[in-house]
Each structure stands twice: as structure tokens, then as C-alpha cells.
Curated annotation (Swiss-Prot):
It comes from Actinobacillus succinogenes (strain ATCC 55618 / DSM 22257 / CCUG 43843 / 130Z). HAMAP family: UPF0225 (MF_00612). This is UPF0225 protein Asuc_0343. NCBIfam families: PRK00183.1, PRK01617.1, PRK01752.1. InterPro entries: NTF2-like_dom_sf, SEC_C_motif, UPF0225, YchJ-like_M.
Length: 154
């Protein structure tokens, strides 16, 4: 018997997020990446969460803090509110609600996440860590100024 994927796609984990988590393949859409990141939090796979954050931000992420949060959180559901697959040629947005419990208290996290495609691979742009100055090069490596690239969508 196989287990359903925690991302609530309705597919078995082995046919859904597991190939992403094991880097056998990459998500083809920002929604797939967002679902796989949610699933990674459920499974406490913080390395995947970090590796799927835009490379320019990975060093700023506090792995211990993320791991502690994952350990203290019981994820109870995911709802995709909206997927905007083509905000630009390389950007996409996904709005979602993630339902969870901390200390038996039910909570909801709503987020409108930005994703960027670099060399054919989707990454999450984390707006909770320090972002470049608007006049500096974009953290995605596009060569554009931040304000004319990822910054325009945050």
C-alpha cells in the first residue's frame, strides 16, 4: 500500500513529490514547487526547502530555526488559492493557505509566493530575508537590477 502525498494533490507520494525531494526530476511549474516545499515541511526535509530557495538567498536562511519550526509544527492541510503561471517570462506566483497546529492551536498561513525560473529550474524567492537594494543586481542572476526583475513582483 502506498501513502498519499502530503501536498494533497491526490497522488501517491512516490508519484508526486518524492521524485522532487530525491532530485530525480524538477518541478515543471511554480505550483508543483510550492506543493513540494509544503510537503518537505510536513516531512521535515529542510535541506530541500533551502535548496529550492533562490541560490542568492540560501546562505541567509537559518537551517536550525527552520528545522525547529518544522519539528514544532503539525501541518494539517494545503489549499491552492491561485496560481499565476506567467507573471513574466521567468516569474510565477502562487497564493496558498497552509493549515497547521502549534501547541494544539489551529492556525492558517496565507501567502502569495514569488517564484523565479533560473536555467530551466523553479526557485522560491523568500521575502522574509534581506533583499537586495532596488539598484543592485537581482538575486536570481538575470543581470537586471532587482527593481526591474524579482523586486517588481514583491
Amino acid at each position: 500500500m502506498t501513502a498519499l502525498c502530503p501536498c494533497q494533490s491526490g497522488l501517491d507520494y512516490a508519484d508526486c513529490c518524492e521524485p522532487f525531494h530525491s532530485f530525480k526530476t524538477c518541478p515543471q511549474t511554480a505550483e508543483q514547487l510550492m506543493r513540494s516545499r509544503y510537503c518537505a515541511y510536513v516531512l521535515k526535509n529542510i535541506d530541500y526547502v533551502i535548496q529550492t530557495t533562490v541560490p542568492g538567498q540560501q546562505a541567509q536562511l537559518d537551517k536550525t530555526l527552520l528545522q525547529d519550526w518544522a519539528n514544532d509544527t503539525s501541518w494539517t492541510g494545503l489549499q491552492i488559492v491561485r496560481h499565476q503561471p506567467a507573471v513574466s517570462k521567468i516569474h510565477s506566483k502562487v497564493e496558498f493557505n497552509a493549515f497547521f497546529k502549534v501547541n494544539d492551536e489551529k492556525q492558517t498561513h496565507n501567502e502569495n509566493s514569488l517564484f523565479v525560473k533560473i536555467d530551466g529550474r523553479w526557485y522560491f524567492v523568500d521575502s522574509t530575508v534581506e533583499l537586495p537594494n532596488q539598484k543592485h543586481p537581482c538575486l536570481c542572476g538575470s543581470g537586471k537590477k532587482f527593481k526591474h526583475c524579482c523586486g517588481a513582483y514583491l
